Swiss-Prot record:
BP GO terms, sorted: NLS-bearing protein import into nucleus; protein import into nucleus
Protein role: Functions in nuclear protein import as an adapter protein for nuclear receptor KPNB1. Binds specifically and directly to substrates containing either a simple or bipartite NLS motif. Docking of the importin/substrate complex to the nuclear pore complex (NPC) is mediated by KPNB1 through binding to nucleoporin FxFG repeats and the complex is subsequently translocated through the pore by an energy requiring, Ran-dependent mechanism.
A Pfam family hit: Arm
Feature: compositional bias, Basic and acidic residues: 26-40
Protein name (database record): Importin subunit alpha-6
């Protein structure tokens, strides 16, 4: 877990929260790679590589019309005779400019073929890729430059080995020079190629950054009035900011924050989406990176974009907001001061499960904050929705809701914890004790322990000697489940279960040799028939 909180927050939690079993660093949780599906999926919202596909047209010169939008794909068939021929290779090595252009266009059309362009055939022809790179330097022939750049773009849209060929032929520094070309088509194709190269992996990304791409790229973004160029340039910039293993050198990419903050007010959803992705990557890290993002002045606009009508904008905006609230309490408060909670409440009812899940994750990092921040979540009427999610949602979303509620029981006041109990949080927490995810079983046990601890304090203060929350847990079949957890394979879980029973329930397990069976399909423990409640232990 790469969670990170400020030292002040850690100390405060250790002193103020009695729940020593819940690691204070874990309360503020960085996004877990295995837990968030959006980045793993090939999502529509963002592609790390894009091929400029070929659409047959009558005009020979591509400079007569804007470059095709990167999100448009084509399945237009290419005539079978268009394969790499000896004539094409001879023409590309000709000294005749017209033949060079004709051959390059033929190669470009082949490389634009969907869905499987013959990249390997092209790069295996000796000297052809190097010839394309040579054509990039033909400033007197912008049409040839453009066609060569397009061909190289599509080679770089392939595998790492394909991208590596483009890098090793020395194309990257030349593409960066072409960002200052007088011809917009050439500029746009150059930035597209650089985006594909940077999008391959961290090694390629860092190579492009070390070639000093950022100053001319930011100048292009500042000066261009062409929407397709802006789209491609922002997408390339987001690829330069992307990656965690390792992340890009922050000093290399942080100068883009001012430009991103301006582009965050674009009216184009594609531009907005990639700006938000870039900000989400930049804020995914330690608190000093989060602070740099905050200082760029983007928070209020990011929160506004949570209510955008296009999910491809909402998803990365939510990711960025969620990353910012993994910071310390002061950084979290910046987001709260932008009226984020009503937006998060809205997103908790989104028809998209992935949005609901990330909204729960974001709220869980807010409830890991101070008591005033927990109260703000209460005042926003978010907890009733969280408890409903805890009861009914998909398991991956329930997990995030469990963190949100347990974090609130860990740092909340007695009144705040009583509020959660009154909303009915005990039953769904008890239901989580039977799932196969050991971490979530621990989270649920910690939440119940915090509630029981409060009940013990209240019973002593009131002189009644009875913990009012023990009965609620028993009614929810929680005691039965805690007893069975004494046979859990995880040492921390069975020790916690033993301690809870010994301290709060004053009973011993009848037969410590009983080990529940596991139903792999249901991902939960199955208890003996006579011990199970009437409605079973369903997720």
């Amino acid at each position: 877990m790469d969670a990170m909180a400020s030292p002040g927050k850690d100390n405060y939690r250790m002193k103020s929260y009695k729940n020593k079993a819940l690691n204070p660093q874990e309360m503020r949780r960085r996004r877990e790679e295995e837990g968030i599906q959006l980045r793993k999926q090939k999502r529509e919202e963002q592609l790390f590589k894009r091929r400029n596909v070929y659409l047959p047209r009558n005009d020979e010169s591509m400079l007569e019309s804007p470059i095709q939008d990167p999100d448009i794909s084509s399945t237009v068939p290419i005539p079978e005779e268009e394969v790499v021929t000896t004539d094409m290779v001879q023409m590309i090595f000709s000294n005749n400019a017209d033949q060079q252009l004709t051959a390059t266009q033929k190669f470009r059309k082949l490389l634009s073929k969907e869905p499987n362009p013959p990249i390997d055939q092209v790069i295996q022809k000796p000297g052809v890729v190097q010839r394309f790179v040579k054509f990039l330097e033909r400033n007197e022939n912008c049409t040839l430059q453009f066609e060569a750049a397009w061909a190289l773009t599509n080679i770089a849209s392939g595998t790492f080995l394909h991208t590596k060929v483009v890098i090793e032929t020395g194309a990257v520094p030349i593409f960066i020079k072409l960002l200052n070309s007088e011809h917009e088509d050439v500029q746009e194709q150059a930035v597209w190629a650089l985006g594909n190269i940077a999008g391959d992996n961290a090694e390629c990304r860092d190579f492009v950054l070390n070639c000093e791409i950022l100053p001319p790229l930011l100048e292009l973004l500042t000066n261009s009035n062409r929407l397709t160029t802006t789209r491609n340039a922002v997408w390339a910039l987001s690829n330069l900011c992307r990656g965690k293993n390792p992340p890009p050198n922050f000093s290399k990419v942080s100068p883009c924050l001012n430009v991103l903050s301006r582009l965050l007010f674009s009216s184009d959803p594609d531009v907005l989406a990639d700006v938000c992705w870039a900000l989400s990557y930049l804020s995914d890290g330690p608190n000093d990176k989060i602070q740099a993002v905050i200082d760029s002045g983007v928070c209020r606009r990011l929160v506004e974009l949570l209510m955008h009508n296009d999910y491809k904008v909402v998803s990365p905006a939510l990711r960025a907001v969620g990353n910012i609230v993994t910071g310390d309490d002061i950084q979290t408060q910046v987001i709260l001061n932008c009226s984020a909670l009503p937006c998060l409440l809205h997103l908790l009812s989104s028809p998209k499960e992935s949005i609901r899940k990330e909204a729960c994750w974001t709220v869980s990092n807010i409830t890991a904050g101070n008591r005033a921040q927990i109260q703000a979540v209460i005042d926003a009427n978010i907890f009733p929705v969280l408890i409903e999610i805890l009861q009914k949602a998909e398991f991956r979303t329930r997990k995030e809701a469990a963190w949100a509620i347990t974090n609130a029981t860990s740092g909340g006041t007695p009144e705040q914890i009583r509020y959660l109990v009154a909303l009915g949080c005990i039953k769904p927490l008890c239901d989580l004790l039977t799932v196969m995810d050991s971490k979530i079983v621990q989270v649920a046990l910690n939440g119940l322990e915090n509630i029981l601890r409060l009940g013990e304090q209240e019973s002593k203060q009131n002189g009644i000697g009875i913990n009012p929350y023990c009965a609620l847990i028993e009614e929810a079949y929680g005691l039965d489940k805690i007893e069975f957890l004494q046979s859990h394979e995880n040492q921390e879980i069975y020790q916690k279960a033993f301690d809870l029973i010994e301290h709060y329930f004053g009973v011993e397990e009848d037969d410590p040799s009983i080990v529940p069976q596991v139903d792999e399909n249901q991902q939960q423990f199955i208890f003996q028939q006579q011990e199970a409640p009437m409605d079973g232990f369903q997720l």
